Amino acid sequence: MDIIFYHPTFDTQWWIEALHKAIPQTRVRAWKSGDNESADYALVWHPPVEMLAGRDLKAVFALGAGVDSILSKLQAHPEMLKPSVPLFRLEDTGMGEQMQEYAVSQVLHWFRRFDDYRIQQNSSHWQPLPEYHREDFTIGILGAGVLGSKVAQSLQTWRFPLRCWSRTRKSWPGVQSFAGREELSAFLSQCRVLINLLPNTPETVGIINQQLLEKLPDGAYLLNLARGVHVVEDDLLAALDSGKVKGAMLDVFNREPLPPESPLWQHPRVTITPHVAAITRPAEAVDYISRTIAQVEKGERVCGQVDRARGY
């Protein structure tokens, strides 16, 4: 069995050695331009078109939870990957736990009004503030996939009212489910905190815009953990300046790295992290990939395959 590997920033040698240990009798090589030798599987992140074009692969694994970079290249270069080749993404591999940590810590930060106290501290102002109450602090999750379900589970521990919105209705215990565009307004109407975990598809690009933000309760908060293209940044800034949105925690942006001149950097109600909410944990990813390859080799049904038409 032959595996080709490409990632612009990962420690390639570590991955090659780890894959050798996890899948004995396998030959793993780092792909370089001009390498046209046969392979059975490809492990990739932002792969060049020439790496995959024309190959008879058993499967391709995206080394992250998102596959938008591959699918966007496929639109421009359909020859990049044959329709018969399954495309898999890393459904969890430690990302769910990281998303839980990130979301819970920020929700509690807002719920306990630490953002307000930080602003008071900046002006040396000592003033206890009225507390928020859980029943008035409904949390809405945009996107009800694997990571969305993990975040919902962790927030249930803190007894917040929870709701989710997705393409199809979910039946998560303790979570009110909304589905389809016709129910989006009703979903938004009670969301004190809006957590975005949507996939990146043509239908979701720019979804968090002026029209959506206006449907939130006054003084709502936004936590974007999905993709920067979901948010119209100028509309968010306007909502922050007007007070419609009280605070935003942003991990992803339309342009990354976020340009130094972006007004988001200096906005007092915005907190920024550099796309670190959930990173690929190599050891857990290798374990998932090795198990999945074994299932493919046996002809078993495998979870995590991307529906190219839907985009996730």
From Swiss-Prot:
The organism's taxonomic lineage, starting at the top: Bacteria, Pseudomonadati, Pseudomonadota, Gammaproteobacteria, Enterobacterales
Protein purpose? Catalyzes the NADPH-dependent reduction of glyoxylate and hydroxypyruvate into glycolate and glycerate, respectively.
Q: Which GO terms describe its cellular component?
A: cytosol
The GO molecular function terms of this record are: glyoxylate reductase (NADPH) activity; hydroxypyruvate reductase (NADH) activity; hydroxypyruvate reductase (NADPH) activity; NAD binding
Stated EC number for the protein is: 1.1.1.79, 1.1.1.81
Q: Which reaction does it catalyse?
A: glycolate + NADP(+) = glyoxylate + NADPH + H(+); (R)-glycerate + NAD(+) = 3-hydroxypyruvate + NADH + H(+); (R)-glycerate + NADP(+) = 3-hydroxypyruvate + NADPH + H(+)
Which family is it part of?
Belongs to the D-isomer specific 2-hydroxyacid dehydrogenase family. GhrA subfamily.
Could you identify this protein by its name? Glyoxylate/hydroxypyruvate reductase A
